[in-house]
Swiss-Prot record:
It holds the Pfam family ATP-synt_C. One of its GO terms (cellular component) is vacuolar proton-transporting V-type ATPase, V0 domain. The lineage of its organism: Eukaryota, Metazoa, Ecdysozoa, Arthropoda, Hexapoda. Proton-conducting pore forming subunit of the V0 complex of vacuolar(H+)-ATPase (V-ATPase), a multisubunit enzyme composed of a peripheral complex (V1) that hydrolyzes ATP and a membrane integral complex (V0) that translocates protons. V-ATPase is responsible for acidifying and maintaining the pH of intracellular compartments and in some cell types, is targeted to the plasma membrane, where it is responsible for acidifying the extracellular environment. It comes from the Eukaryota. GO terms for biological process: proton transmembrane transport; vacuolar acidification. V-ATPase is a heteromultimeric enzyme made up of two complexes: the ATP-hydrolytic V1 complex and the proton translocation V0 complex. The V1 complex consists of three catalytic AB heterodimers that form a heterohexamer, three peripheral stalks each consisting of EG heterodimers, one central rotor including subunits D and F, and the regulatory subunits C and H. The proton translocation complex V0 consists of the proton transport subunit a, a ring of proteolipid subunits c9c'', rotary subunit d, subunits e and f, and the accessory subunits VhaAC45 and ATP6AP2. This is V-type proton ATPase 16 kDa proteolipid subunit c. Residues 1-12, 79-96, 157-159 are lumenal. The keyword Transmembrane applies. It is a multi-pass membrane protein. Residues 36-57, 119-130 are cytoplasmic. Keywords: Hydrogen ion transport, Ion transport, Membrane, Transmembrane, Transmembrane helix, Transport. It comes from Drosophila melanogaster. It is found in: Membrane.
Amino acid sequence: MSSEVSSDNPIYGPFFGVMGAASAIIFSALGAAYGTAKSGTGIAAMSVMRPELIMKSIIPVVMAGIIAIYGLVVAVLIAGALEEPSKYSLYRGFIHLGAGLAVGFSGLAAGFAIGIVGDAGVRGTAQQPRLFVGMILILIFAEVLGLYGLIVAIYLYTK
């Protein structure tokens, strides 16, 4: 340990960066898992009566998976910037924590929205095919919630 550990660069500074990286991947993966599970059960229920629509109905599952990629990107960026405490300020630790929480919680919210919309949309599309376009539009708006978190996280990361 270097003697450069100070009040600006405390020994626990990198802890906040690690928590930011962990928050980014954990919360966005939770959102992606919920979105995948919820829309996947809708696909399974729908495919009993309309098996020809399975591939068309896989879109919500793919969109939920993309949410986890947002968290992965931010987690890797933060993990790559971690350094020993003498070179890692408390300010950077807090910024990285904020970036991880921003993408993580927005990914969690987006995953919930994608799962609920995907489940109802897939089941509705099986009964009325004209609902497909509406489902896709609503899914795009839900996906953008996660993208907003990614943008804020990258902006914070570059500070």
